[in-house]
Amino acid sequence: LHVVQQMRQGGIVNSEGANVYTSSGHFVLANTRGFMAGYPYSRHSISVSPIARDASGMQRDDWYSSSRLHAELAAPEAVGEYAGRRALARLGARKLRTRQCPVLFEAPLACGLLGNFVQAASGGALYRKSSFFVDALGTQVFAPHLSIEEDPYLHRGPGSSPFDEEGVRGLQRKVVKDGRLEGYFLSTYAARKRGMKSTGNAGGSY
């Protein structure tokens, strides 16, 4: 209640709602090649989208906490307070003139950029030749200080899985090493179309 009062005094006037999500189950995959296996799963999350207002107008933002274990979720008060601060920080925003300058991306936006990278390095875009990464293995695609690792077996990782949607085991690997593209995300079909081997990514990255 104290946090809510502070947010109201600071300019939070409403919200677009808060959500609590929880699920658990057991996934089983069987196919005509004789593969059958499964694993238990769980996912829990809380989120909120507050609205801030001042003389310049209204702004909204959001924040969330997500984990395989509900005990590892951030406290609801902490999620709400941070979401409120994000909404308040948007008030009074103004446009910049066109310029060239370094840009620092916050974590959620950086994840979105990585999603664009995965899409461009995935089988469908590659065999249709609609990606700028066609035949780009070994070439410099990022700055030398950047490496991207895929680990399907990361303990309690949100995307961890012992196998993909075809029953193929995923690979612990560096997809980008020192800025160079070292691997693609391929299902068996996409791999055949490219004359390569499956990387265990039917259904996407881990």
Protein language model features and the residues they cover:
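N-terminal small-residue-enriched
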Residues: 1-206
